[in-house]
Design a protein with these regions (language model features):
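Active-site helix of classical SDR
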Residues: 122, 158
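SDR active-site lid
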Residues: 175-237
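Residue(s) in the substrate-gating loop at a strand-loop-helix junction
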Residues: 142
Length: 266
């Protein structure tokens, strides 16, 4: 779907890749509903995007609140414009611990943000997409969905679930005008650990241990994928290489990642 003239809803728009998606979309002539928990961060995103009230609608929202999510399509259409493109970008990682040491509270939070919230957003907006005979759903999965990362087993499971959901949705909608895209980012230079409430050295932006794609570059790749209606978008050589390697030699791929990440595992 062409970005110019379209209205996008982007979650996690207050920082990192989400913020860059907003900036890129507005630069391409789109209007954006920017969703994030942090109201101040949304104001900063608006400023960085050089946006005005005609092109930018900030919405401070907890996306795990299913009641508020269900009410979004009518609320946004009434106060702004009907949403054409839904980008489920928001996500969090788990504490870097083994499954046996993962607390139930952390399990519930990761699954709520990474899987249940995107599902509820899809269920909220899909009926209007089908009725209007146009729309695009973009779900941000992860390289972790197909590459085993020690200490991030639940995170990987949540992203694998989202990937499987998106693949099924693509199949269900293949004969409609509603497009579906799964995004598989590799390592992106964002503050995902900090934003997930996790104090962790070596994972966030500025880490020298892992070569990362910039959020700006990642956003450019995603937006280009939307315009070309691509069903799958891989970001970074790491995501592409590990996708192939995991298929060809899963044991070697697991050992390779374990060697890279073992120092982070508590």
């Amino acid at each position: 779907m062409k970005l110019a003239g379209a209205t996008l809803l982007i979650t996690g728009a207050g920082n990192g890749m989400g913020r860059e998606l907003v900036i890129g979309a507005i630069a391409a002539g789109a209007k954006v509903v920017a969703v994030d928990l942090d109201k101040k961060a949304l104001a900063t995103t608006k400023q960085l995007a050089n946006a005005d009230s005609k092109s930018y609608y900030p919405l401070a929202l907890d996306i795990t609140d299913s009641r508020k999510v269900t009410a979004l399509p009518k609320k946004i259409a009434k106060q702004f414009y009907p949403v054409d493109i839904l980008i489920n970008n928001a996500g969090i990682i788990q504490p870097f611990v083994r499954i046996n040491d993962l607390e139930q509270k952390a399990i519930a939070k990761v699954m709520a943000v990474n899987f249940t919230a995107p599902l509820n957003l899809i269920k909220a907006f899909l009926p209007t997409f089908i009725a209007r005979k146009k729309g695009h759903i973009v779900n941000t999965s992860s390289m972790g969905a197909y590459t085993p990362v020690p200490g991030q087993s639940l995170y990987g499971a949540s992203k694998a679930a989202l990937s499987a959901l998106t693949a099924g949705l693509f199949s269900e909608l293949i004969d409609t005008n509603v497009k579906v895209t799964t995004v598989f980012p590799g390592a992106i230079a964002t503050n995902i650990a900090k934003n997930s409430g996790i104090n962790l050295q070596g994972m966030d932006a500025g880490s020298s241990k892992i070569k990362m794609t910039t959020p700006q570059k990642a956003a450019q790749i995603i937006l280009a994928g939307i315009e070309k209606d691509r069903p799958r978008v891989f970001i970074g050589q790491d995501a592409k290489v590990m996708n192939l390697l995991t298929r060809l030699n899963p044991q070697y791929a697991a050992r390779l990642i374990q060697k890279q990440m073992k120092d982070l595992l508590k």
